[in-house]
Regions:
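Catalytic-core segments of nucleotide cyclases and related cyclic-nucleotide turnover enzymes
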Residues: 11, 15-19, 50-82, 88
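GGDEF/GGEEF active-site signature
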Residues: 3-51, 83
């Protein structure tokens, strides 16, 4: 697992960027040799959109919220994006 933090002008733009990444990985058709879930490598994404963080927000809070979204993507079938506005 890894995190990507980036600035965008809108939530729709963030979703578009992440969907493009998800699709590019899927299109690579990298064989997942020992996977019992799928034949090819895919990615599940938890995307949290923060319009404006409070001054006392910390990175642990943000990470915890986005991590929950990632596991929603995995639990709902993988190879997808789960997104939500995050208020911190």
């Amino acid at each position: 697992e890894f995190a990507i933090i980036f600035e965008v002008d809108s939530k729709d733009n963030a979703i578009s960027i992440m969907e493009n990444l998800r699709k590019k990985v899927e299109d690579l058709k990298i064989i997942a040799c020992n996977s019992t879930i799928c034949n090819y490598l895919t990615i599940s994404i938890g995307l949290g959109y923060i319009k404006k963080a409070s001054p006392d927000a910390n990175s642990d809070q943000i990470y915890d919220e986005v991590d929950k979204l990632l596991y929603e993507s995995k639990d709902n079938g993988r190879n997808q994006i789960t997104t939500r506005d995050i208020i911190v």
